């Protein structure tokens, strides 16, 4: 059963994201007193009592001819066209501004059910003539931040939603269940949003030549080859030393949190600004968090044909040298804007996701362990006693984690652990997967 869709529309900083968080089942929008934080259509499941719906947060709109404003208007127009109900928000502190009047006319021409939501009303509020002149028959005064007036808003929402669509509970969500969460990460302006738009064949995310357009993590539910996918676009991650504004800090924190809860991370790298230390830092962070990763070099169409082979050789060398913990990681060269090789990226993600969830039987593990340690045994210790790894078992997946029992685990060097991990990746077909070993001392002192 299709859920009702409610769009929150208004000029910048009227409190749309605050109300979005109030109505959503879980907080998803960054809230900041700087205007224009939201730049993409942001979707979440919302709920009022027993009623469930899909909620859209939209960019703040203002009358401005620059290209960014035009692109923001396109995002909001798409949300209005999708919506069954529009909540048009204004700020009671500033009163009705010229942009509010222009936007109200813009909304009314679509002939959709709408509610005028006057936000930031911390005290008793009386609607005067200027609010009625906006042309809405339903008006509610609220404070989204403090929660006042929300019951009145809930009543209006339920009353104004079209009756021919049911909004009862137990609505089937096609993307619940075994859903692969794929986070798109990278430095600013690497083409992350362009990649997602190309993948889903929709201008879902705002793109452009400006660095840092995406400020929040945007989730998109999608299906690919009968797999439920949640694509998560994130703000570009800059070096810590260059993050000075509080909003940039919030955006970076939001992106980092998305990586922590990801299944797979696609690291997008700009071919015209190849492999910087920040790219390596992001990849290391992903591996240290135990997430699976696919590396994508975007804007490959802009690299000269005569330079591509040398580029790839140097790129692979740098990855293998600086990121040994994800040795064998999939690297794909694409052009998001031309939709070149983009499906290969998703295929690689699904493969690595499967390997990230891999469970290996104890018998196969110990057969491999015996062969590998005999081929390259640990060196003898003082007194002629050899350090031995007697037994191992897998204790978890996501990432694959193994417990190894040894007579003297503290003598097992990091280099020997790398030897075992690299050999395991090859033996069990787990290239690029972060693998974790936990050594335990055997209780029997004679082994």
Swiss-Prot record:
Keyword tags: GTP-binding, Nucleotide-binding, Repeat, Ribosome biogenesis
SUPFAM superfamilies: P-loop containing nucleoside triphosphate hydrolases
GO biological process, one term: ribosome biogenesis
Membrane spanning stretches: none
Domain EngA-type G: 4-165, 180-357
Residues binding GTP 2, per UniProt: 186-193, 233-237, 298-301
This protein's record includes keyword Signal: no
Keyword Translocase: no
Top-rank taxon, per record: Bacteria
Molecular-function annotations in GO: GTP binding
SS bond partners: none
Positions annotated to bind GTP 1: 10-17, 57-61, 119-122
InterPro entries: G_ENGA, GTP-bd, GTPase_Der, KH_dom-like, KH_dom-like_a/b, P-loop_NTPase, Small_GTP-bd
Domain KH-like: 358-443
PANTHER family cross-referenced by the UniProt entry: GTPASE DER
Subunit structure: Associates with the 50S ribosomal subunit.
NCBIfam families named among the record's database cross-references: GTPase_EngA, small_GTP
Family stated for the protein in its record: Belongs to the TRAFAC class TrmE-Era-EngA-EngB-Septin-like GTPase superfamily. EngA (Der) GTPase family.
Function of the protein: GTPase that plays an essential role in the late steps of ribosome biogenesis.
HAMAP family: GTPase_Der
Name this protein carries in UniProt: GTPase Der
Organism: Rickettsia canadensis (strain McKiel)
Gene: der
């Amino acid at each position: 059963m299709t859920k009702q869709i409610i769009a929150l529309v208004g000029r910048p900083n009227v409190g749309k994201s605050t109300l979005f968080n109030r109505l959503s089942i879980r907080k998803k929008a960054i809230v900041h007193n700087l205007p224009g934080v939201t730049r993409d259509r942001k979707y979440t499941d919302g709920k009022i009592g027993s009623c469930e719906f899909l909620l859209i947060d939209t960019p703040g709109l203002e009358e401005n001819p620059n290209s960014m404003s035009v692109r923001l208007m396109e995002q909001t127009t798409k949300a209005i066209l999708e919506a069954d109900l529009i909540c048009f928000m204004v700020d009671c502190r500033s009163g009705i501004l010229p942009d509010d009047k222009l936007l109200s006319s813009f909304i009314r021409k679509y002939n959709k059910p709408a509610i005028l939501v006057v936000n930031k009303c911390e005290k008793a509020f009386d609607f005067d003539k200027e609010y009625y002149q906006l042309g809405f028959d339903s008006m509610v005064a609220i404070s989204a931040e403090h929660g006042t007036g929300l019951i009145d808003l809930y009543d209006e929402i339920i009353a104004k939603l079209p009756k021919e669509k049911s909004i009862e509970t137990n609505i089937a969500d096609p993307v619940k269940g075994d859903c692969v969460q794929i986070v798109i990460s990278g430095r600013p302006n690497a083409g992350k949003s362009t990649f997602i738009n190309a993948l889903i064949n929709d201008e879902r995310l705002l793109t452009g030549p400006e660095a840092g357009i995406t400020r929040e993590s945007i989730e998109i539910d999608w299906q690919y080859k009968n797999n439920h996918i949640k694509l998560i676009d994130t703000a570009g991650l800059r070096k810590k030393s260059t993050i000075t504004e509080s909003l940039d800090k919030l955006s970076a924190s939001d992106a980092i949190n998305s990586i922590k809860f990801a299944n797979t991370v696609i690291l997008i790298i700009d071919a015209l600004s190849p492999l910087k230390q920040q790219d390596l830092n992001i990849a290391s962070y992903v591996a240290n968090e135990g997430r699976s990763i696919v590396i994508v070099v975007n804007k490959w169409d802009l690299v000269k044909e005569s330079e591509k082979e040398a580029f790839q050789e140097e790129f692979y060398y740098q990855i293998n040298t600086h990121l040994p913990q994800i040795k064998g990681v999939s690297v794909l060269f694409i052009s998001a804007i031309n939709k070149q090789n983009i499906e290969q990226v998703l295929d690689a993600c699904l493969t690595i996701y499967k390997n990230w969830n891999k469970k290996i039987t104890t018998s196969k593990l110990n057969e491999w362990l015996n062969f590998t340690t005999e081929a390259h045994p640990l060196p003898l210790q003082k007194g002629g006693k050899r350090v031995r790894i007697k037994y191992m078992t897998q204790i978890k997946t996501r990432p694959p984690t193994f417990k190894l029992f040894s007579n003297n685990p503290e003598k097992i060097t990091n280099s020997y652990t790398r030897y075992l991990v690299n050999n395991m990746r090859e033996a069990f077909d787990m290239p690029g997967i972060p693998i974790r070993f936990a050594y335990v001392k055997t209780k029997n002192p004679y082994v």
